[in-house]
């Protein structure tokens, strides 16, 4: 009954936090032998973490940098790098999202910021409007893979792994996804007879590189300090905010004090929504733990088959399905504790497992029917969800191929953390 409450509320389009919270509250109140005071205590304790402070600060840093005009600088640099290739602006969209990912770990922020600029340009270059939107939607999902990644932070806290190691684990898959998307953009360009209208110029590249340096320095400050042992990810996030304010006020001079209340409000809302979802998902996850659901899932799956390859495929299928239906933060908090016993039985490294989980869930961002970036894309690109769904499936297939590579070639995710000593 308590699970049915969440399912019914989701079917009626209720916010995911309300669905999870109502289900957990019903269990605490009427089903389980649990003191009701445990519910608010669980909500508070689940987000009362110094590490979790990194999330609102990274969101704020990304919003500040976007308001400072660095998005246009990164797009200009991307044009100078790959604009001369066939299907150039498709490649530019991918590269720009990869750059933007280093200052904002949010796919939604990347989709809105890059998409609003690139979709009209892609149309002018000869891409169909729905195709242009699909490229921007799919490439925006590189954001949560490349550090600093908000989903990786949530997974690290939930599974008890190193945030620094998880950041590194997502970097190589993010680059691979970018390259795969660029190959598909080349195919689309040849199919639609889109020719390169720009020529590569080292002088222009150098000029745009210098112009973009203020944005490119930010990930160096964040990641250099973390891996150099100078500060924690949370401290890195606060330094990123300070740097973004300095850049916006004194370097680009596009950030005005009158903009600050709206930026702070938007960042607070985005952070609060995520934290509320995490808190409610934790309350529900603890019920699942009390009922020994994680052990039951592991036992049932291993009883179904002992073949590791089949189990990993089933795991990917489950995560992809969940990613299509649920908020990423809620999915991580709810399902990671349930799946950890199975991961341990399969002998998976927790960093590798974390990359598997987050990448499958990220693919759900642009997978019909309810991928969150699909709806951001329809708003930014001014297309219907039906038009976007028709062109998005090849991108979903590319994402699934990446998930399988990450699953069955652990070195893709573990090579960089191992090299850095994690």
Task: Place the predicted regions along the sequence by residue.
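Alpha-helical transmembrane segments of multi-pass membrane transport proteins
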Residues: 1-422
């Amino acid at each position: 009954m308590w699970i049915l409450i969440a399912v019914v509320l989701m079917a009626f389009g209720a916010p995911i936090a309300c669905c999870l919270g109502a289900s957990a509250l019903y269990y605490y109140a009427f089903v389980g032998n649990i003191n009701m005071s445990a519910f608010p205590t669980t909500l508070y304790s689940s987000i009362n973490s110094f590490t979790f402070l990194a999330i609102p600060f990274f969101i704020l840093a990304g919003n500040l940098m976007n308001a400072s005009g660095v998005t246009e600088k990164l797009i200009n640099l991307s044009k100078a790098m790959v604009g001369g290739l066939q299907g150039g602006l498709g490649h530019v969209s991918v590269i720009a999202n990869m750059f933007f990912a280093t200052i904002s770990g949010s796919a939604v922020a990347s989709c809105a910021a890059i998409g609003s600029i690139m979709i009209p340009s892609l149309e002018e270059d000869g891409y169909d409007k729905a195709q242009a939107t699909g490229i921007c939607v799919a490439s925006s999902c590189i954001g949560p893979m490349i550090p600093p990644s908000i989903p990786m932070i949530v997974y690290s806290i939930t599974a008890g792994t190193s945030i620094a190691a998880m950041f590194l684990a997502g970097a190589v898959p993010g680059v691979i996804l970018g390259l795969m998307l660029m190959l598909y953009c080349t195919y689309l360009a040849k199919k639609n007879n889109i020719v390169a209208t720009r020529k590569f110029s080292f002088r222009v590249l150098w000029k745009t590189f210098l112009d973009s340096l203020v944005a490119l320095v930010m990930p160096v400050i964040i990641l250099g300090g973390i891996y150099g042992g100078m500060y924690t990810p949370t401290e890195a996030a606060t330094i990123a905010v300070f740097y973004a304010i300095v850049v916006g006020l004194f370097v680009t001079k596009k950030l005005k004090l009158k903009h600050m209340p709206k930026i702070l409000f938007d960042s607070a809302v985005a952070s609060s929504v995520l934290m509320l979802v995490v808190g409610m998902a934790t309350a529900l996850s603890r019920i699942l733990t009390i009922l020994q659901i994680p052990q039951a899932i592991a036992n049932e799956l291993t009883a179904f088959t002992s073949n590791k390859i089949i189990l990993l495929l089933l795991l990917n299928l489950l995560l992809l399905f969940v990613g299509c239906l649920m908020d990423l933060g809620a999915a991580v908090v709810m399902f990671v504790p349930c799946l950890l016993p199975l991961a341990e039985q399969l002998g998976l490294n927790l960093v590798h497992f974390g990359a598997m989980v987050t990448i499958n869930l990220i693919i759900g961002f642009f997978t019909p029917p309810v991928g969150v970036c699909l709806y951001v894309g329809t708003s930014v690109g001014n297309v219907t969800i039906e038009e976007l769904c028709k062109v998005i499936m090849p991108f979903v297939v590319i994402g699934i191929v990446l998930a399988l590579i990450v699953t069955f070639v652990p070195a893709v995710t573990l090579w960089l953390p191992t090299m850095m000593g994690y």
